[in-house]
Each structure stands twice: as C-alpha cells, then as structure tokens.
A protein has these predicted regions:
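Intrinsic disorder/low-complexity segments
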Residues: 1-15, 194-231
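Glycine-rich phosphate/ribose-binding loops and adjacent secondary-structure elements
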Residues: 2, 195, 233-235, 239-283
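Non-catalytic, usually N-terminal nucleic-acid engagement modules in DNA/RNA processing proteins
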Residues: 2, 16-198
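Gly/Ser/Thr-rich helix-start
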Residues: 40, 51, 76, 86, ...
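Residue-level recognition of conserved structural "scaffold" positions that shape functional pockets
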Residues: 46, 118, 134, 212-218, ...
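Generic detector of short, well-ordered, non-transmembrane alpha-helical segments enriched
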Residues: 69, 146, 202, 218-219, ...
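Conserved functional loop/turn residues at catalytic and ligand-binding sites
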Residues: 154, 227, 258
Length: 283
C-alpha cells in the first residue's frame, strides 16, 4: 500500500479544538466538560444518533431546546459516504451546513457498519471490500479513505478506522482482530495528521471504491472553509472482544500511538450483558 506517513517532525497530532476537564468525582464516576470549537458539552452526555445527518422523528429545534439541550450528535460515516455522497456534502460546505446543525458533531469511522454486512464483505490488511446495501455496488473502505471522508464531513471528533469483531469470538481470533485494529489505528493517525496539516487533500469523487488512492507528493495549503484554526480531534478505539487481557493490551498500545481521546469499541455485539459491564468497569 502507498505510505501516507508524513515527515517525523510532523507526525504528532497538533493542537486540536478539543479539551476535557474533570470537575467532580465520586468513586469511579466523573463529571466534566468537553470544550469543542462549537461549544461546551457537559459529561456524561447522551449523544443522539443522526445516521444520515438527521435524528429520526425529532427536529433540530427540539434537540436544541432547553429540555433536551443536545450539545453533540453523531453522524454515520458509512451511510453519508454512500448517500448522499461526499461530493454533495462538500459542495454545501461540510456536514454542519448540509444539515443545518450548528453544535458539535462526532462521526464514526464506518467500521461497525461494515461489520454488520457479514455476508457481503471481505476484510484484508488494506481495508474492507463490501457491497453497498443500497445498490450492490462494490465499495472499498480503508483507514485512509475513512479519514478522508471524516475530514471532508468536518466533524469535531473523528474516529479511527477499526475492525469490530463479534463479542464471543475465541482468544486467537480476537487477538488477530485486535492487531489489525492497532495497525489500522496507526494508519488512521498518519492519514489524519497529513490531512489536517494540508499535506494531503481529500480526493473526493475520484474513484471511491476502486482501491487506495495515491498520496499527493507535493505539499498543499490548508483546506479552505475549515472550522477554525485548530484541527479536528481524532479518537482511538479499544478492541479485544470479551477477553480482558486483550482489552488491557489494546488500551496500552492505542494510548502509545497517541490520540485526542479513546473509545471502548466492540460492545453489545453478541456478548452477555454481565460481560459487557465487566469490560466497561475494567477498562
């Protein structure tokens, strides 16, 4: 695969627009505030899911009203990429302008949705090949492409591309999946750093699903129409299925790669509820 690794001096994540402050603790519980370029979010927080850019059955005015006061919603990278397509969203100035939402957004990487397409996908070292659930077209999603899509969407928080294994797989299979996720995490970070620094520009509309596109060799200026001086934040994802030793190892090694924040992935994917709660408590 083509290397997207920028010079060593620029590999580390530059200052993002994200800050987190813990304001109170009680036992393992914490209350805090996340500061983004689009306002503050008190935690813990409920994040409504806007799969295709809208939260079903409720208007944004209601989400923003005092009784709900939703400060962040989630956009689904996989679904937005396939329909309406990134070219359409880019032409509107990014996802916020496309949907008319002025508060913070988090976009997932597409990994979970691809996992759900068990019968029509193929996972390789390069990424995931799958059939669109819309028209059956052959598509290809990789760490690099996921980062390009999320950069173009312009969310405040992007997620690294990961493999989401079933919750009840055996230890050997879970380790193979975890190792792949860790390699993809490194590639996600390298691509994200390059994109945010303007070293790569999303080549939107140039053969999505036809394989990995080549990195641009010449430096590029920062992308126009950005969301401020500070860049999009990138979160790493902890995997390891239901095996606590793998979860702990995944946590340590993902932190070593270095992200702005960390998510616990691969929960509620077939494991028993007590196992899920044990993983959350342990991590």
């Amino acid at each position: 695969m083509p290397s997207l690794k920028p010079p060593a001096s620029s590999l580390e994540l530059q200052a993002s627009s994200l800050a987190f402050e813990v304001q109170a603790r009680e036992g393992e519980a914490r209350a805090g505030v996340i500061t983004t370029r689009r306002g503050q979010i008190e935690t813990p927080v409920f994040m409504p899911v806007g799969t295709a850019g809208t939260v079903k059955g409720i208007r944004f005015e209601e989400l923003e009203a005092a009784d709900l006061d939703a400060r962040i919603i989630l956009g689904n990278t996989y679904h937005l990429w396939l329909r309406p397509g990134i070219d359409v969203i880019k032409a509107c100035g990014g996802l916020h302008k496309f949907i008319g939402w002025e508060r913070a957004m988090l976009t997932d990487s597409g990994g979970f949705q691809v996992w759900s397409l068990t019968e029509i996908r193929k996972i390789t070292e390069e990424g995931t090949e799958f059939r669109s659930h819309i028209d059956g077209a052959l598509c290809f999603l990789s760490p690099e492409i996921s980062m390009e899509v999320q950069t173009a969407l312009g969310s405040e928080i992007a997620m690294a591309f990961d493999e989401c294994p079933p919750g009840q797989i055996d230890h050997d299979a879970a380790r193979r999946s975890m190792e792949l996720t860790l390699r993809w995490a490194q590639r996600s970070k390298e691509a994200h750093v390059a994109l945010q620094a303007g070293m790569l520009r999303p080549s939107l509309g140039e053969g999505w699903g036809e394989g990995l596109r080549r990195a641009k060799a010449s430096p590029l200026p920062p992308l126009p129409g950005g969301e401020g001086e500070k860049r999009q934040a990138l979160f790493g994802i902890i995997q390891g299925a239901s095996h606590l030793d793998l979860r702990r190892e995944s946590l340590v090694r993902t932190v070593e790669i270095g992200f702005d924040g960390y998510a616990i992935g691969g929960l509620s994917v077939g494991e028993e509820k007590p196992v899920m709660l044990e993983i959350i408590e342990d991590i």
